[in-house]
Amino acid sequence: MNKLISWKPRASIHNLFIRAKIINNIRIFFINRGLLEVETPVMSHTTVPDIYLFPFQTNLYFLEKVPEKGVPMYLITSPEYHMKRLLAAGSGPIFQICHSFRNQEYGNYHNPEFTLLEWYRPYYNMVDIMDEVNIFLQTIIHCDSAEMLSYQQVFRLHVGIDPLLAELDELNQVLVKFNLSSTISLYNDRDKLLDFLFLMLVRPHLGNNKPVFIYNFPASQSLLAELNSDDHRVAERFEVYFHGIELANGSRELTDADLQRERFMQENNKQVAMNRPPRLIDEQLLAALECGLPSCSGVALGIDRLLMLTLKAKHISEVMAFSVTDA
C-alpha cells in the first residue's frame, strides 16, 4: 500500500456540505420563480467558434462511419446552444446547473471542468435580467445590492480613456503610461489591448464592497448578443464582478439567424488568421434561430466561484471535491 499517494478530496467535507446546500438553494430560487430545470448534452457535434475558448475534443465511433477516424465530438464550453434550441421549441423560461469544460489554464479561479448555472428568460431585456441577477446574488450569498456601470464609464474612471473612441496609438500610449508595454506583445489588435487594459487596470477595482455590473461591452466583443438599438458600437452584454472575481456574464440574445451566421464566419476568419483551423458552425442552432427564437435574455454564472466568495476560499480546489490535479 502506497501511503504517499494523495487520494483525499482537496475540499473539506464541511465545504462540500455548504456546496450542496447552496446548489439546492439555487434550484429553489428558480423553481419558485417559475423556471423549468432542464438537462442538455455535455457532448456536442459542434463547438463555439470563439477565438478565446478552447474546447476538449474526442471522437465517437459509429459502426456505419469510418472506424479508424470516428466522428469528432466536443465537450460543451456552455449549454447555451442547446438551451436556445429548447427556447425556440417553446420551453418558456429555463435554467440548468451542469458541468462545462474549457481546455484552458488551471489556477486560483479556473478548473478545466467546472459547474455552470445558466438561465434564459423569454421577453426579458438586458435590464430585466440584470435585475434578476442582482436579486439572485442578494438571496443566495446575502450581499448588498449591486452597482451598475457601463464599460465606457469604468474605462474613463480607471484608465482615463474612452474605449469606444480610442485608437491603437492611444491604447499603446496607455500601456507605456502604466508601465505595461513590456508585458504584452500584441500591439496591433484593438480588442486584445482593451481586454488587457480591462484586466490590469479596471478589474482590480471592481466589486470590492458589493457586486458591480459592467454593461454595454463593445460590439466586437459580443459574439451572441444583440446590438444596442441606440448605439451600434456596443452590444447589450454585461459581466458581473465581486471582489475582483468575474462571477457571471449575460446578454440580450441575438435572435437573427443570418446575423449569427455572419458573426460565426467572422470569428472563424479570425481563427484562420491565427493559423488555427476554422470550427464547424452549429447548423442546428441556426435552424432554431431561423424557426424563431423568442426575444430573450440569458446569464451564465460560475457556481464554483460563487462558492469561493461564500466560503472565502483562495483556490477553486477548496470548493470542489476533486479538481483536475486530483481527478
From Swiss-Prot:
Positions that bind substrate: S78, P79, E80, Y120, E253
EC number(s) from the headed UniProt entry: 6.3.2.-
Catalytic reaction annotation: D-beta-lysine + L-lysyl-[protein] + ATP = N(6)-((3R)-3,6-diaminohexanoyl)-L-lysyl-[protein] + AMP + diphosphate + H(+)
Transmembrane segments annotated in the record for this chain: none
Gene3D superfamilies xrefs: Bira Bifunctional Protein, Domain 2
A single Gene Ontology CC term: cytosol
A molecular function (GO) term: acid-ammonia (or amide) ligase activity
Major enzyme class: ligase
Pfam families: tRNA-synt_2 (PF00152)
Gene Ontology BP annotations: lysyl-tRNA aminoacylation
Xref: PROSITE patterns: AA_TRNA_LIGASE_II
Record-linked InterPro entries: Aa-tRNA-synt_II, aa-tRNA-synth_II, aa-tRNA-synth_II/BPL/LPL, EpmA
Record key words, sorted: ATP-binding, Ligase, Nucleotide-binding
Family listed: Belongs to the class-II aminoacyl-tRNA synthetase family. EpmA subfamily.
NCBIfam families, alphabetized: genX, PRK09350.1
Assembly mode: Homodimer.
Name of protein: Elongation factor P--(R)-beta-lysine ligase
Protein's organism: Baumannia cicadellinicola subsp. Homalodisca coagulata
